[in-house]
């Protein structure tokens, strides 16, 4: 049985029928694998986009951390409203929502950085 570390840092067993378990949000990865939704992965991706624009010194900025936290909350709340009983999301839907929240909150440069990174990763996957 596979284990996954959750956003709280605990290990969670993922059963083969995890995709059928009600009440949980799950993410379908590009390879078709279904994993537990992890808010921290969204937060890390947003922070990396901010660091790409603001520079590594932004990692110590309370302002940046607060903005990243709020943006992460905004992204997660969209999916919680859409699927209050849980459900499956495709990774692309999550990434699209991150882009949208960055733009709505007037972080155009960060959104551009995020989009360019997504495109770069897409090209790398296509070459593999």
Stretch-by-stretch model annotation:
Residues 1-128:
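Extended catalytic cores of very large enzyme megasubunits
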């Amino acid at each position: 049985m596979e284990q996954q570390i959750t956003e709280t840092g605990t290990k969670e067993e993922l059963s083969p029928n995890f995709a059928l378990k009600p009440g949980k949000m799950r993410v379908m990865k590009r390879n078709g694998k279904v994993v537990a939704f992890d808010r921290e992965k969204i937060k890390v991706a947003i922070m990396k986009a901010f660091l790409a624009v603001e520079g590594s010194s932004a990692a110590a900025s309370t302002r940046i951390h607060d903005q990243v936290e709020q943006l992460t909350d905004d992204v997660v709340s969209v999916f919680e409203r859409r699927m209050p009983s849980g459900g499956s999301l495709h990774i692309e839907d999550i990434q699209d929502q991150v882009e949208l929240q960055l733009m709505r909150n007037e972080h155009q440069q960060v959104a551009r950085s995020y989009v360019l990174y997504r495109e770069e990763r897409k090209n790398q996957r296509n070459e593999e």
